[in-house]
Amino acid sequence: MSEQGKLILFSGPSGVGKDTLLDILIRKNPNFQKSISITTRERREGEVDGVDYYFITPDDFEAMLDCGEVLEFAKYGKNLYGTPKKPVDKWLAEGKSVILKIEVQGAAKIKKMYPDALAIFIMPPSMEILEHRLRRRGTENEDDLVRRLSIARDEIEKSRDYDYIVINDSLEAAADEVLNILSKE
């Protein structure tokens, strides 16, 4: 029987580079498994079902909630986002390290269910750099950008509840720091 895997909670403000960091980590360590969230939102151009998210209907989402198949969920605007329970438990039982890219409220819920989970907060070098990254991404209008930056400030406030804080000033350096943290845990 294989040793139980490690659950890693990966949070940080929108635009901090979580997805890119996750891709680097998984490339560097094939034992890492990225959990894919479910969502009721429309698929964006270039997104692939089962790779970026599992895109499901609101009725299917509600059915999964009713059956206890969702570890945690949150509503953003009109859309629901959640973490499916079955694949996470399967990968942990197989000895894989499972990384959940998750917002701070969800991380707090998961930490209560899985107290041994390791929580890592990805921090921008500064709010100015974060704003620049979000503007460069070009996916938000000005109102959305202001809202995201306000949410980012709130999330950064809660970063003290995490086991580790990693500043993403350089993707490779941040990835190496996360790998170093995980090798010690």
Tell where the protein language model's regions lie, with residue ranges.
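Walker A/P-loop
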Residues: D19
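Post-Walker A helix-loop "phosphate-sensing" segment adjacent to the P-loop in P-loop NTPases
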Residues: I26-S35
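ATP-binding Walker
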Residues: V16
